[in-house]
Amino acid sequence: GGCIKWNHSCQTTTLKCCGKCVVCYCHTPWGTNCRCDRTRLFCTED
């Protein structure tokens, strides 16, 4: 269980980011420096 908090580092294969709309975003083309710091477009927290 558990989830990764906003702006904490993440890997797309492990725990999900906290919040339904929050996604793990990698800041380099080769898939490193990934953080839970993006939200899905047109997504609302329910």
Swiss-Prot record:
GO molecular function: sodium channel regulator activity; toxin activity
Record keywords, A-Z: Disulfide bond, Ion channel impairing toxin, Knottin, Neurotoxin, Secreted, Toxin, Voltage-gated sodium channel impairing toxin
Intracellular or extracellular location(s): Secreted
Cystine pairs: C3-C18, C10-C24, C17-C36, C21-C43, C26-C34
Disulfide bond as UniProt keyword: yes
Keyword Nucleotide-binding appears in the UniProt entry: no
Major localisation: secreted
Any one GO CC term of the record: extracellular region
Tissue specificity statement from the Swiss-Prot or TrEMBL entry: Expressed by the venom gland.
UniProt domain comment: The presence of a 'disulfide through disulfide knot' structurally defines this protein as a knottin.
Family of this protein: Belongs to the neurotoxin 02 (plectoxin) family. 02 (plectoxin) subfamily.
Function field: Competes for binding at site 3 of the insect voltage-gated sodium channel (Nav). Insecticidal neurotoxin. Causes temporary paralysis to lepidopteran larvae (10.3 nmol/g) or to crickets (doses from 0.93 to 119 ug/g). Is not toxic to mice when injected intracranially (high doses).
Other known facts: Shows very weak inhibition on rat Nav1.4/SCN4A sodium channels (23% at 50 uM of toxin and 35% at 100 uM).
Listed name of the protein: Mu-hexatoxin-Mg2a
Origin species: Macrothele gigas
